[in-house]
């Protein structure tokens, strides 16, 4: 090889190296928001890193925190279980799209009671969180559980202390099934809880329930399973006792009108074996991306997750979105997420 050829080869190698470094840096992304989807987002990120080398750092700080950070443009994407209203999206220049479907369950710590051995209905759950049902052997509970030996002990209520999309989903359900809750408390990421110990994040609530006998708390299903917590059955909209599962979360989404809006409320939906506290969870991105490479990289990551993350999604007890909805999302990316010149990033 001549000196000129060696020099040319070295220049090409350096150029390729610099190009690779630039591409790698462009795909290092940060996201923050709900703890509800954190298990699946973090596993997707690990698998994506293995497949592509790209680094995706997701922090489960709560949905309210995720919304604040994407509005402040301190993260590349935010995450929230509570969909933002259209006027708030427009005001802040944001676009939202769903990723997976999950379920909120009632985790309990009652000596001798295993998962699925206790059944509750919406009115009773609401009355527990209103502080009206105070004992585990209250008639409201025992009539739903004939033959189940329940202790004459206080119910220790656990709820979220932080702004939470999981709380939004849970209180949306309670507002539908308990008229007193609807009129006195309502729904939201944060509400004026009448009773209860506050835990930060799904993991904080799970930790309280795990160590506090007689407790009940609401958590995303994966957190109950990962922490070995017992969870209840719930009566669905048809009055049938249903267990939480990836399938029952999917059933809750069957009646959703996705073509009308991505922001579908899946709580207390009619349908055979539909879990009453099911929900989609959402990603928030800036509609106009100042950094086009990062904006495109966010969409590339979630596109990869839709194509390749289904097995992971289901293994962590979330349900995948219907294929038709994913295609609607991809079409929406083309018209809603652009660079500063107006060029589509997908």
Where are the regions a protein language model picked out?
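Bacterial N-terminal signal peptides
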Residues: 11-22
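Bacterial N-terminal signal peptides that target proteins for export
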Residues: 1-11
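Flexible loop/hinge segments at secondary-structure junctions
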Residues: 25-346
């Amino acid at each position: 090889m001549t000196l000129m050829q060696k020099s040319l080869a070295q220049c090409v190698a350096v150029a390729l190296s610099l190009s690779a470094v630039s591409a790698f840096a462009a795909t290092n992304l940060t996201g923050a928001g709900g703890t509800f989807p954190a298990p699946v987002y973090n596993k997707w990120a690990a698998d994506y890193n293995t497949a592509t080398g790209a680094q995706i750092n997701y922090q489960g700080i709560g949905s309210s925190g995720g919304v604040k950070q994407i509005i402040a443009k301190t993260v590349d994407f935010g995450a929230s279980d509570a969909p933002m209203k259209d006027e708030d999206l427009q005001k802040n220049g944001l676009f939202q799209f769903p990723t997976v479907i999950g379920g909120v369950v009632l985790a309990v710590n009652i000596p001798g009671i295993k998962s699925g051995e206790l059944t509750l209905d919406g009115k009773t759950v609401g009355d527990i969180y209103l502080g009206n049902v105070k004992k585990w052997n209250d008639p409201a509970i025992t009539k739903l559980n004939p033959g189940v030996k329940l202790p004459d002990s206080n119910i220790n209520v656990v709820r979220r202390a932080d702004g939470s999309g999981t709380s939004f989903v849970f209180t949306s359900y309670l507002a539908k099934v308990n008229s007193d809750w609807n009129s006195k408390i309502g729904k939201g990421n944060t509400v004026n809880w009448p009773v209860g110990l506050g835990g930060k994040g799904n993991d904080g609530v799970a930790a309280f329930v795990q160590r506090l006998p007689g407790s009940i708390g609401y958590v995303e299903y994966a957190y109950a399973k990962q922490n070995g917590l017992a969870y209840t059955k719930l009566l669905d909209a048809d009055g049938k006792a249903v267990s939480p599962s990836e399938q029952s979360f999917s059933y809750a989404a069957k009646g959703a009108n996705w073509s009308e809006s991505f922001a579908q409320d899946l709580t207390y939906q009619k349908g055979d074996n539909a879990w009453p506290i099911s929900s989609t969870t959402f990603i928030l991105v800036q509609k106009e991306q100042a950094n086009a490479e990062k904006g495109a990289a966010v969409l590339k990551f979630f596109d990869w997750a839709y194509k390749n993350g289904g097995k992971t999604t289901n293994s962590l007890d979330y349900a995948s979105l219907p294929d038709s909805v994913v295609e609607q999302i991809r079409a929406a990316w083309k018209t809603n997420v652009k660079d500063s010149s107006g060029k589509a990033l997908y």
